[in-house]
Amino acid sequence: RAFEESFRKLNIPYRIFGGLSFYQRKEIKDLIAYYRLTANHRDEEALKRVINYPARGIGKTTMDRLLVESTEREVSIWDLVTDVFNPPVSVQGAALRKVQDFTSMIQSFAAEMPTKDAHDLGMYIAKHTGLVHTLYQDKTPEGVARYDNLQELLNGMKAFTDQAKESEPDELPTLGD
């Protein structure tokens, strides 16, 4: 990852052989998708990626129904499931509650954006989504590597925010900026 970061910083093209780029790994893409959805609730790609990861009982059938209904209504999936005056008719009961619990969780992350830096928000998201717990529970070599990769991403965010605090202590941007 250190080489990748250095090459990116210097705008040097590079190619990874025999593995994945750090930022192409599932666990990294998942946390970044949570960031994206926190900053932009209508990011459908991010929503579809993480709405049921870690597993929260929101399956393909529920998502297919929401996608069809949101297309028919010409609104985003987010707008469809958060409209209290005109809730979805294609998904109801326990399935709808699970989706609404998910949107409430994302809204709680958004409420933290103005007060947390990138690292603190990342830690908050990773903990409250269950990403850290899910990856920590997987004791296979791949699971341990995924957990380590997530920790490395969070450590990189910490280094970035610490460096930014040192150079401009009064002007550290938050994700909300």
Report each predicted region and the residues it spans.
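Acidic beta-strand-to-loop metal/phosphate-binding motif
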Residues: R1
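Conserved helicase C-terminal RecA-like lobe
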Residues: E4-P13, R25, I32-D177
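Conserved helicase motor
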Residues: F17-R25
